[in-house]
Design a protein with these regions (language model features):
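Glycine-rich S-adenosyl-L-methionine
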Residues: 32-60
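Short, functional N-terminal and low-complexity linear motifs
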Residues: 17-23, 48-53
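C-terminal catalytic and target-recognition region of SAM-dependent MTase-like enzymes
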Residues: 1-15, 19-21, 27, 42, ...
Length: 138
């Protein structure tokens, strides 16, 4: 896929808004659970891993890749990034300066984040589930 269009140039930054189960937007899109199958989280996690692995070589040394999903499932968020960094010694989780307040930090602190998610909360506390991780190439 990448080899078909890539010129060999490395990039300073890449945003990977990965395809996901959209489990974090059920509040706004109540049809999401009805359009998903039990195997979707695992299938999409494999696709996310494939995309991460395909894009990582395109990030120049010192560059960054921002990975995000609108999923609340660990396999599409923190577990995905833990697996990726375990398999890529040149990938380092990076603190995200200026991140919105009210975020819940996961392990390691201040590096991987997900917005608190409560679909039954009253406005204005209601918001979508979201995950992001900023990776820097060493």
């Amino acid at each position: 896929m990448v080899s078909e269009w890539h010129s060999g140039r490395e990039f300073d930054a890449i945003l990977l808004d990965a395809p996901c189960t959209a489990s974090g937007i059920v509040r706004r899109q109540p049809d999401v659970p009805w359009s998903r199958r039990p195997e979707d989280p695992a299938r999409l996690a494999r696709e996310q891993a494939r995309l991460l692995n395909a894009l990582w070589p395109l990030v120049k040394k010192g560059g960054r890749l921002l990975y995000c999903t609108c999923s609340i499932f660990p396999e599409e968020g923190p577990d995905q990034i833990r697996r990726f960094t375990a398999n890529h010694g040149d990938a380092q989780l990076t603190a995200f300066k200026g991140a919105p307040t009210g975020m819940m930090s996961l392990v390691p602190a201040d590096h991987v984040h997900e917005l608190p998610f409560n679909p039954n909360a009253a406005e204005p506390l209601v918001h979508d589930g979201f995950f992001y991780a900023l990776l820097t190439k060493l």
